[in-house]
Amino acid sequence: MAETFHFSISMISRGKSKSAVASAAYISCEKIKNEWDGEVHDYHNKKGLLHSEIFLPENVPIALKDRTTLWNSVELNEKASNAQLARNFIIALPKELSLEENKDLIRDFIQENFVSKGMIADLAIHQGNDEGNGNIHAHIMTTVRPLN
């Protein structure tokens, strides 16, 4: 297994001039318009995305499985100029495991630590520029409070 392990946590907040929509567009390599400020965040040409998926707790509207709907709902729900919008996690994954094994590993982690506690989680697994499985890592964004 890995000799070193990276795990970082940060807050995405307007007080730090950050946007949940911009962060979601970046990690998912998508183009998403932020309905809060009208800005379009376009990362569809970004390379390295291996997998993305949204996890919903029970009793959450299925419409929030759509990334644009989810993060725009968060942006529009929070009114304060310094609002905390999402938690952001970056986790190194074991390069010794296959992509499918890493997906299973991170899915279990997300279910146990976030979804079971009522949070929505947005996962993106990235591959660095290395050949093979080097620098494989997960980006996870979670909601700060329940949405319904």
Predicted regions and their residues:
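N-terminal nicking endonuclease/strand-transfer module with a His-rich metal-binding environment
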Residues: 1-148
